Amino acid sequence: MATTTLGGADYAAAVAAPGIVLVDVRTARSGSSRAFTAVFEAAARRHPDLRFAAVDADAEAALAAELGVRSAPTLMVYRDGVLVFAEPGWLPGDSVDLLVATVRDLDMAAVVAQYPEPLPRRPG
């Protein structure tokens, strides 16, 4: 599945959807963001059953600030509307695949039971 672009108006609904949503918060001026974009797009092709989305942190500065993003790229992963991963920096392709497998295997009932309130935002 192709990567979609999210903005402030559609972000909340997109990440609240059932299933797994990976979000790359990126900026065009960051070399690391540009490098991770290729990795992220390739992962999207390998996992067409998942939703891959990007947020342009320059164009959506208010959204990036609301999410607590302080550096790009930052990868955020939601499952069934729950933020289960958020880290700054880029991952190689095999690490993205391992992360996808880990998120697929999560026992979401246990996650929600242990963390009934959303975790504080802390991406870099």
Tell me the role of every PLM-derived stretch.
Residues 13-14, 63-66, 99, 108-124:
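CheY-like receiver
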Residues 16-30:
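Short active-site neighborhood of thiol/selenol oxidoreductases, capturing the structured segment around
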Residues 79-112:
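Non-catalytic, surface beta->alpha helical segment in thiol-disulfide oxidoreductase systems
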Residues 63-72, 78-80, 84:
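Structural alpha/beta surface segment adjacent to cysteine/selenocysteine redox centers
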Residues 3-7, 25-27, 37-62, 72:
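Thiol-based oxidoreductase modules, predominantly thioredoxin-like and allied folds used
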Residues 3-20:
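A short beta-strand-turn-helix
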Residues 33:
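Conserved phosphotransfer microenvironments
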